[in-house]
Amino acid sequence: MLVLLVVAEVPLAIGVLRPRLEPVPRRTDVVYAIGPADFHMAQARDLMRRTGASTLVVTISVDPRTGEEYRKDFCDPSPHWKVICLVPDPYTTRGEAATLRDLAARHHWSDAVVLTDPPHVTRTRVWMDRCAAIPVTVVEATDRASRHVNLRGVAYQSAGWVVGQVQSCP
C-alpha cells in the first residue's frame, strides 16, 4: 500500500512543484486573483495593466470566529477598472471556478486570467477547465510569499487534485 501511495504521489508532486505554465495573453476581460490573494495584489494590478482587463476579481477570506469578511484596501474602488471582492461558495478552488463561470455569464466575459500561488497552479487549472465555461489562463504568482513550498503544502495540493478528479462543479 505504501508503494502505491508513493507511486501515485510522485507525479502529483511534480505537477505541484513544477506546473505547466502558460504565457500571459495580450488581452483578457478579467483578472481573478484567487485566495487568499493578499501577497500578490501588485502582480494582479500589473496583469490588469498589461492585459487591459476591465475587471479585477479577488477572493477574500472570512474570519472563522465571526464569519465576517476580511475586506482589504485592494477592494476599494479603482479609477482604472471595476473591482469585485468576494467569498466564493463553497470557499474552495472549486467554488472559485464556479464563481468565475457565474460572473462570466453575468458580465459577458469571453476569457480570464487567474492568478494563484505556484503550488496551486495545477489544481486551479483542473477546476477552471472543468467549471469556468470560458478560456482561462492560469498564471503563477511570483511574490516571495507565494514561493514558499513545503511538504505539507505539496501533500495538501496533491490531495486537492485527487478530490478534483471525482467532484463535479457546484
Show where each model-derived region lies.
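A structural signal for short, hydrophobic/glycine-enriched beta-strand patches
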Residues: V16-A155
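Hydrophobic membrane-insertion alpha-helices, especially the h-region
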Residues: M1-A13
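A transmembrane-helix-recognition feature enriched in membrane-embedded lipid enzymes
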Residues: R147-P170
